[in-house]
Each structure stands twice: as structure tokens, then as C-alpha cells.
Regions:
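Residues lining hydrophobic/aromatic ligand-binding pockets adjacent to catalytic sites
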Residues: 1-233
Length: 233
């Protein structure tokens, strides 16, 4: 039985005070409060700047055992197996056992490039839970992409959005879903996540963060629906 991890794609939105967070809660206490209600977060800030070991350690110290951080690879890493990737791989161990998947996102203008994907996958440690979120539709049509991901044990993020859906491709260790709709079928998703966890893989589901407190409340509602399963902790 795998474990189900549920969260949002950020945790420090000021507009969540007075709803998800108590009014007046200092920003430095937001993560600890968040982790008391959800067991994972997809970190959006690392897309724009490289995380530091000290920053990652500080995050890890604020959350309980069993919590997971899904880290977005910085934009400058892209699909390039160079110095930025090496730096990212060097700092990630600072999270210790709180490290979950690492999400690599390609920009909407980047067409499918199986060669670039293969070069990056060749540089990733097999133990890393690598997940890819391809924004150009050509990646879904390129047959080599799924083959390369499966060979490397990497996953493709599933997408449930108003613009359409992308089916998740499980990795060797996890299944990853990004729930981008403001309204999604909570009961249906809970059943789906439980069924996937029963296959033995860890399952991650992240609700899109919004400026208001609705998104974390939707994540909590999904977690409560899933909580009847022993896979959620």
C-alpha cells in the first residue's frame, strides 16, 4: 500500500489568513500550521529561484515526520543537464526524508524534444522521484517520451484543468496529479487516489493555489475524504 499525499501549490498566500490560517498568523508560522492540516506541499517559489541548503533545512524543521515537499526545479534548469541541475541536486539532500518528488516543468513554447529529455534523465539519480509537466501538447503526441520516462522510472504529471486533461504516467515510486480546476469532483478523486495507492505507489495530488483561502480548503476537503483510507497519514 502506497501513501497518499495531498496539498496545494504554495503555502504562504497572505489572503489565506482569516480563512485557512488564523487572522494575524505571522508568515514564519504559516508552514507549521499548514503541515498540521495537510501532509505535502508543491513548492512554487523554487521555480523562480534556486533553493539554498539553509532554507530547505529550515522548512524541514517546521514539519512533522511523514510530510513531503515536492520541489519545482528552477526554470533555468529546464531540460539542460548542466551546472544549474548539478547545483539543484547538490542542495536537495538538505530536506532529508521530507523530500518528495522533483517537478520539472517545460514552458508552453518548448516543443517535444526526446533527445533533450533523454540527456536530462541520464543525469538524474535513480533514487530521485522525477516528475515532468510538459506544457506543449506535442509532448503528449511524441511516442518516445513515455518510453524514456518508463525506462528511467520517472513520472508524467497528470493534469485536471479547465483547458483539458493529461493522463498521469506513473513513475517507479509515485503517481503525481495537479488539480487545476477551482471545482473538481472530490469524491471521485478520493476514490481514484485510494485505488492508485492500493497498487503500491505513493500518490501525490496538489490543488492549484489561489489568492483566496478556497484552494487550501478544497485540499483539506479532499484529504478528509481520502482519510478513511490507511494510505493517508
Amino acid at each position: 500500500m502506497g501513501t497518499i499525499f495531498i496539498g496545494t501549490s504554495a503555502f504562504s498566500e497572505p489572503g489565506w489568513r482569516g480563512g485557512f490560517y488564523p487572522a494575524g498568523l505571522p508568515e514564519q508560522r504559516m508552514l507549521a500550521h499548514y503541515a498540521s492540516r495537510l501532509n505535502a506541499v508543491e513548492v512554487n517559489s523554487t521555480l523562480y529561484r534556486m533553493p539554498t541548503p539553509d532554507g530547505l533545512r529550515a522548512w524541514a524543521e517546521q514539519v512533522p515526520d511523514g510530510f513531503r515537499f515536492a520541489i519545482k526545479a528552477p526554470r533555468r534548469v529546464g531540460l539542460l543537464p548542466g551546472a544549474p541541475l548539478d547545483r539543484l541536486l547538490a542542495v536537495l539532500p538538505a530536506l532529508g526524508d521530507r523530500l518528495g518528488p522533483v517537478l520539472f516543468q517545460t514552458p508552453a513554447f518548448q516543443h517535444a524534444d526526446a533527445g533533450a529529455l533523454e540527456a536530462l534523465l541520464d543525469r538524474l539519480p535513480r533514487a530521485l522521484q522525477a516528475v515532468f509537466d510538459f506544457h506543449h501538447p506535442s509532448w503528449q503526441r511524441e511516442p518516445a517520451v513515455e518510453r524514456l520516462l518508463r525506462q528511467a522510472g520517472a513520472a508524467r504529471a497528470g493534469l485536471d484543468a479547465d483547458s483539458g486533461e493529461v493522463t498521469a504516467i506513473p513513475g517507479s515510486a509515485c503517481v503525481y496529479h495537479r488539480l487545476r480546476r477551482r471545482a473538481f469532483a472530490t469524491h471521485a478523486w478520493a476514490s481514484r487516489l485510494r485505488a492508485e495507492a492500493e497498487q503500491g505507489l505513493d500518490v501525490y495530488a496538489f490543488v492549484k493555489h489561489e489568492a483566496d483561502a478556497d484552494s487550501p480548503q478544497r485540499a483539506v476537503a479532499l484529504a478528509q475524504e481520502v482519510a478513511r483510507s490507511p494510505a493517508y497519514r
